[in-house]
């Protein structure tokens, strides 16, 4: 469950290391975002000479949460850290590599690129 002010790791090579959620997209009073939801983020920590600079604002898709996601068979997939992948205005990933596992819930038409770049799909 990601809400405003939540900090997330960045799971792509866009150059950002940590981001902070500044808005959960998808409704005027929407409070929480889960895996596969799009949020608006601000870059809080970045590596030098990278595409994403500190203070930049991007869209991002949540790929891992501590809260996890419940499957129809009753199992729950949880992670140690919250993580997101930065997106451009066309909702395509900015980076060319994805770090760490992603869940099968991202296998929608919109995020197939992220699933194909990920080293592991759970």
Swiss-Prot record:
Disulfide bonds: none annotated. One of its GO terms (biological process) is translation. GO terms for cellular component: cytosolic large ribosomal subunit. InterPro entries: Ribosomal_uL14, Ribosomal_uL14_bac-type, Ribosomal_uL14_CS, Ribosomal_uL14_sf. Keywords: Ribonucleoprotein, Ribosomal protein, RNA-binding, rRNA-binding. The keyword RNA-binding applies. It holds the Pfam family Ribosomal_L14. GO terms for molecular function: large ribosomal subunit rRNA binding; structural constituent of ribosome. Gene3D superfamilies: Ribosomal protein L14. HAMAP family: Ribosomal_uL14 (MF_01367). PANTHER family: 50S/60S RIBOSOMAL PROTEIN L14/L23, LARGE RIBOSOMAL SUBUNIT PROTEIN UL14M. NCBIfam families: rplN_bact (TIGR01067). Binds to 23S rRNA. Forms part of two intersubunit bridges in the 70S ribosome. Part of the 50S ribosomal subunit. Forms a cluster with proteins L3 and L19. In the 70S ribosome, L14 and L19 interact and together make contacts with the 16S rRNA in bridges B5 and B8. Belongs to the universal ribosomal protein uL14 family. This is Large ribosomal subunit protein uL14.
């Amino acid at each position: 469950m990601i809400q405003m002010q939540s900090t997330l790791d960045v799971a792509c090579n866009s150059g950002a290391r940590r981001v902070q959620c500044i808005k959960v997209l998808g409704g005027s009073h929407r409070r929480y975002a889960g895996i596969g939801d799009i949020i608006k983020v601000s870059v809080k920590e970045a590596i030098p000479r990278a595409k994403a600079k500190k203070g930049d604002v991007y869209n991002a898709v949540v790929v891992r949460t501590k809260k996890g996601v419940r499957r129809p068979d009753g199992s729950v997939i949880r992670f140690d850290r919250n993580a997101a992948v930065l997106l451009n205005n066309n909702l395509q990933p900015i980076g060319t590599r994805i770090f760490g596992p992603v869940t099968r819930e991202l296998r929608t038409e919109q995020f197939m690129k992220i699933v194909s770049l990920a080293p592991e799909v759970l």
